[in-house]
Each structure stands twice: as C-alpha cells, then as structure tokens.
C-alpha cells in the first residue's frame, strides 16, 4: 500500500478578502501561516515522513510547504516546484471580490464561473499585464501552453501530465510524497484519483491547510482517503469554502 498526502495552501490574503485569486501571486495571512504550522505539527505527531514534496510556483503554496516541513523538522526534504500545480486561472475575474461579483451577476453565475467543469470566465487580453507571459517564472514555458483563463477541465488537462510523469512514478518507486497546491489543482488530482464525474466534482470543497491522506493500492487506485485533524473543524472549513461565492445577505 502507498500513501499520498495532499494539502491545500493555508489561508491567503485574497482568501481573506474573498477575491478570485487564480495565478495572482498573493501571500499567506498570519492565519494561513498558523494553519501550515499546525498541519506540519499534526503530520509529525501522526508519524508522517516524506521522501519528496511538490508545490506549485505560487508563493502561498511554497510557503505553506516550507512552514509545514519546518514544523516537522524536515526542511531537508527535496522539493520540486512546477507550474502545472498552479491554481486554476480565473481570467478577467482575478482580483474581483466573489461576493460582490455574485451580487452583480447572481450566485448561480458565480458558481458556474467558480466550479463549472467546462465553462471558463472571460480570458485576459494577450497584452494584459496580468497575463502569465509577462511573468519571468514562466519564461521557459511555451507561450501556447500558458492560460489566459481556464475551466476545471482545462486545469485537469494541465495537472494530469505532472501526475503521470512525476508524482505517480515517484509513488510507484516507493517514495513518500507530499503535495502542497491549490483548491482546483487538488480538485483535478482528486477527480482523477477517485474517478469523480464532471457534475459531482462541482460539489467538492477542499479546506485550507488540512492534510488529506490517500491510501493507494499497487495500481494507485484509492483504498480510502481521510483528513487528519478535528472532524468538526474540517467540516466547518469546507462549509466556509462553499459559501465564498455567494452574495452577502443584508
């Protein structure tokens, strides 16, 4: 049996402000840093050790990983960073407040933009300074691979090559792997692992800073999965994620 641990980054500044973040490189809040520290302490207390860790190239995931590894006294763990683990790109929605956008366009439309499997928001213009082609961290990525917007289907197509070419081979080689990434890039991995339908994946809510353990068979199919930590706290965190895209009630 193999084990894989997935962890969404801790609360970011734009999580706190309820903004569409996507590929915008915002940092963790103090709460997010504490979530990462507690996650690392929990992993250490439960006896987890890792041979290899992966994160996206966005600082909220990288910092979450480093804080967690530091709390585990495991800063020596080899780390691989890859853009394919980035959050879903939200196009022109990036930077907008989710509740304000819901008040303007309706909860249903915002839910579609946030979660619909095959519907992407309006793309960034190719000359928009927010376009990833202007970011030096993506300089070696072919321009045609860099998104100006994504639906979840696009995110799955981006993430799965990294699973197939890097994460899965490492697990099959017996390496214990930790992945620190984002709500939608982790949703893409979970959809693949659990064979979740396009419709059902919309309902999956992943809380920040909570280690999610997958026990996998020899074919890397899930035997079971579970969050570490307090069940009530995790349920409350999931509910908070689900409520992010709703208009505020007077």
Swiss-Prot record:
Keywords, comma-separated and alphabetical: Gluconeogenesis, Glycolysis, Isomerase
GO molecular function, one term: phosphoglycerate mutase activity
Pathway the protein acts in: Carbohydrate degradation; glycolysis; pyruvate from D-glyceraldehyde 3-phosphate: step 3/5
Residues annotated as site: Transition state stabilizer: 182
Active-site residues from the entry: 9, 87
SUPFAM superfamilies (UniProt xref): Phosphoglycerate mutase-like
Role summary: Catalyzes the interconversion of 2-phosphoglycerate and 3-phosphoglycerate.
NCBIfam families linked: pgm_1, PRK14115.1
Subunit structure comment from the entry: Homodimer.
Protein's name in the database: 2,3-bisphosphoglycerate-dependent phosphoglycerate mutase
Species: Bordetella avium (strain 197N)
Record lineage: Bacteria, Pseudomonadati, Pseudomonadota, Betaproteobacteria, Burkholderiales
Name of encoding gene: gpmA
């Amino acid at each position: 049996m193999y084990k894989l641990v997935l962890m969404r980054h801790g609360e970011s500044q734009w999580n706190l402000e309820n903004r569409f973040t996507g590929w915008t490189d915002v940092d963790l809040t103090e709460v997010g840093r504490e979530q990462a520290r507690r996650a690392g302490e929990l992993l250490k207390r439960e006896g987890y050790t890792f041979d290899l860790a992966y994160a996206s190239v966005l600082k909220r995931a990288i910092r979450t990983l480093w804080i967690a590894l530091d709390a585990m006294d495991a800063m020596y763990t080899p780390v691989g960073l890859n853009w394919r683990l980035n959050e879903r790109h939200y196009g022109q929605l990036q930077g907008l407040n989710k509740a304000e956008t819901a008040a303007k366009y309706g909860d249903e439309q915002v839910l579609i933009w946030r979660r619909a499997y095959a519907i992407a928001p309006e793309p960034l213009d190719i000359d928009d300074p927010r376009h990833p082609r202007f970011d030096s961290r993506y300089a070696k990525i072919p321009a045609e691979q860099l998104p100006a917007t994504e639906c979840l289907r696009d995110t799955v197509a981006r993430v799965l090559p990294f699973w197939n070419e890097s994460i899965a081979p490492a697990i099959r080689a017996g390496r214990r792997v930790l992945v620190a990434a984002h709500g939608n890039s982790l949703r893409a991995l979970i959809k693949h692992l659990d064979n979740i339908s396009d419709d059902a994946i919309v309902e999956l809510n992943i809380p920040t800073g909570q280690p999610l353990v997958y026990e996998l068979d020899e074919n890397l199919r899930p035997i079971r999965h579970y969050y570490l930590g307090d069940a009530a706290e995790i349920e409350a965190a999931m509910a908070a994620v689900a409520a992010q895209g709703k208009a505020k009630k007077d």
